[in-house]
């Protein structure tokens, strides 16, 4: 919903709720690109769409980031073996952002109309006033949705940090399976011999240094050979060496 300017004195205050709602929109819009890549419909995060349903957001629960991480760890055993397929479904539900925005708009609009009904026509000229807008911006439901948006942005960063690993697993046709006996998630490779070979970091570093040294040494050797075999190359770089003169008798 939109509010107009409320005059010269309170022109700056008339945009306070809209800035509050704009921050929610920005958080939700910027968290979308990080969550576009996702597994298939019955994949790892299919339960997140139900877990982030609006019925949980309507209840103003004490939702903190440590509680969210503990909840995520408790939901980790629900992972089912599946081959990752990306860009098919939003891990938190593609309609979740629309639901949040509609709920914010609906709750604030309902509170405004309740104020109008109780205060009568005299409240219309104070609707865009500083006091009314300050009360609206300090509503518990607005603060709660802002907190939910921050939690969702954090969860999107948490999931997007693992998208590279899952994408690499998808290239190798690797699946995930939760082992109830060992209480951990295991990788399932298509064949026993396709397990990737891990290279030691020191060996990798030595090979990189050896490659750099060999390339530099080969280039220096080639330059010396050309310097000795092509005399004109010396004059290109400005070296005019004296040559031996033979005196004829």
From Swiss-Prot:
Glycosylation sites: 173, 179
Cross-referenced InterPro entries: Arteri_GP2a
Transmembrane segments: 208-228
Signal peptide span: 1-35
Virion surface topological intervals: 36-207
Topological domain spans for side Intravirion: 229-249
Predominant place of localization: virion
Compartment annotation: Virion membrane; Host endoplasmic reticulum membrane; Host Golgi apparatus membrane; Secreted
A GO cellular-component term linked to this record: membrane
Subunit-structure text: Heterotrimer of GP2a, GP3, and GP4. The GP2a-GP3-GP4 complex associates with the E protein. Interacts with host CD163; this interaction plays a role in virus entry into host cell.
Listed name of the protein: Glycoprotein 2a
